[in-house]
């Protein structure tokens, strides 16, 4: 979302990559010197075919954020690799604006639509290489741990997945009565969940 080319160039010099939430952000990053292959696009508003083709042809990856987007990806890029953004069924945010998971959120493919997803993937010969979930920027460790479990269950549904992107911000308390995310409280049970998944 950063519009400042100098900051984007600084990020590039640090070896960071871009998680773009619109085609405009992706194009802005390319204009600042990023390779398209360093950009992942997850967007509510799917771009026009020509703009999408241009960056995908140069290596940009796409997370389909709805069944309709997945169908379009399959039509435009049959037999390609694709990421999937799922709504894991729960979210965490200090306000409704920062809570981007759960029934009230329009972000991501609803996790219970997994059979519909598999049908589209199979029909277009797609290879799902990444699962992306994003619950918001809340501080509740219990929600984060549940989201990890749900996300790992989604990973189990696709044999070729090599990347799990657990999205969401870590809340920083700015006012005396606001909580800050306790990374230790979140991190330890998340690590245990990943270790159980690997065993």
Q: Where is each model-derived feature located?
A:
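Active-site-proximal beta-alpha core segment in soluble small-molecule metabolic enzymes
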Residues: 1-163, 189, 193
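Active-site anion/phosphate-binding pocket segments in diverse small-molecule metabolic enzymes
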Residues: 71, 168-199
């Amino acid at each position: 979302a950063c519009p400042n080319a100098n900051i984007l160039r600084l990020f590039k010099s640090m070896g960071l990559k871009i998680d773009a939430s619109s085609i405009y952000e992706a194009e802005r990053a390319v204009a600042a010197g990023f390779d398209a292959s360093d950009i992942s696009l997850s967007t509510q508003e799917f771009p026009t075919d020509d703009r999408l083709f241009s960056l995908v042809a140069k290596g940009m990856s796409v997370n389909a954020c709805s069944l309709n987007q997945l169908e379009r990806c399959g039509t435009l890029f049959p037999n390609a690799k694709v990421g999937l953004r799922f709504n894991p069924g729960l979210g965490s945010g200090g306000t409704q604006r920062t809570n981007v998971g759960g029934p009230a959120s329009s972000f991501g493919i609803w996790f219970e639509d997994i059979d519909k997803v598999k049908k589209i993937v199979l029909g277009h010969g797609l290879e799902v290489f990444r699962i992306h979930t994003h619950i918001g920027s809340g501080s509740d460790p219990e929600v984060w741990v549940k989201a990890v479990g749900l996300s790992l269950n989604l990973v189990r549904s696709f044999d070729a997945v090599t990347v799990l992107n657990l999205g969401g911000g870590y809340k920083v308390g700015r006012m005396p009565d606001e909580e800050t995310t306790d990374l230790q409280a979140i991190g330890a049970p998340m690590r245990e969940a990943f270790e159980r998944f690997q065993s």
